[in-house]
Amino acid sequence: SGGMMGIPSSSESIAPLVSAETARRIDNEEPFEWKIGGDVSVGKLVRQQFGDDVVDHVVSALLGGVYSCTADDLGLRATIPALAASLDKLAADGPVKLSDAVRAMEQARPRTPGKGAPFQTFRGGYAEVYEALAEKSGADIHLDSFISGVTRESEGFRVKGAPNEAGLYDRVLFATPAPTTARLLPALSPAASAVLKKVKLAGSVVVGFKFDSDTDPNGNRLPDNTGILVGTDQTDVHAKAFTLSSRKWPHLAERGGALVRASFGRFGDDALVRAEEDDLVDYALDDLQHITGFDGRAAGVSEIFTQRWFGGIPRYDETHLDTVAAAHAALADVPGIEATGAWSGGVGVPAVVADARG
């Protein structure tokens, strides 16, 4: 409990996960100079103030579940902007402590306990949303069209690869990954294209299971929590996280059995993303048993589903926000062209929707 994305205000909340020496270091943190408006990788900052244990055991595990990157690959302002703002505020009075910045955020949180499930979703999944949006938009949607570029003509934009009957378009919105957008833009904005080529992507793969029961024949049950995060220094475990879906989403438990999702892959290491499905299934079942004691094979596996995302999420490093600003500044000089996506507004549906509306 407490803290911010695994970064603690004291050793109390993470003491079982770090060494006694690290705990003392957290509680006796040395002040440091923070440049107002500056940026740094989350990993570098936390290692500097609290040591490697906190990054490798806690922070990278939490951030990796969201961004498919370690803390060392992620910029503070792009991923934890509120913490950067807290450091900025404290730095107005001189040297700062990371623990003080986190504590200030903890104290600013609403104290009213929430009611109901901490996670919410659509009973039929996000497919319900996509289908409703497609229907309400009234748009002509062309699936499986290979778009190779966009060019300007006297009366509008031509999208290369769109069906011939589509003709010219008054405006074009690119809602594609940054490298894809970069490849489509050279004829319209060489500057934006060059900037977006700098954005690197992380891949991931999930393996979903439906077990016949949440208890194996030896009485080992799946944990009652909603998920499991794995530290980056756990070399004997392949998975980076498990989502206990039937626990996290109560309506899924109504289907019977137990639904569990194993997640693999981090930035810079696509070996697991490209691994054979049979190997991924074995890794997931072995890791789950190693961590929880639950033997999924013995409990019975009735369904398996694998989904891969090659380059599914940007690396939000300490230069990312400047890259985004430069890309949008270049596109502002091209009337009729807009770009959005996770590279622009941040990870997650709310962030992407907010950026698109902006």
Language-model regions, residue ranges each:
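A short alpha-helix-loop-beta-strand transition element characteristic
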Residues: S1, D53-H57, L201, N218-L222, ...
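Dinucleotide-binding Rossmann-like beta1-alpha1 core, especially the glycine-rich loop
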Residues: S1-W34
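Conserved flavin/dinucleotide-binding core of flavoenzymes
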Residues: G2-M4, P8, E12, N225, ...
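Active-site/ligand-binding neighborhood in enzyme catalytic cores
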Residues: T22-G149, L168
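Generic solvent-exposed, charged/amphipathic alpha-helical segments
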Residues: R47, Y130-E135, A182, P186-S189, ...
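Short, surface-exposed acidic
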Residues: D52-V59, S193-K197, F294-E303
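A structural signal for the hydrophobic beta-strands that form the central parallel beta-sheet
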Residues: I141-L143, F174, A339
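Mid-domain catalytic core of redox enzymes
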Residues: S145-R261, G265-V273, D278, H290-I291, ...
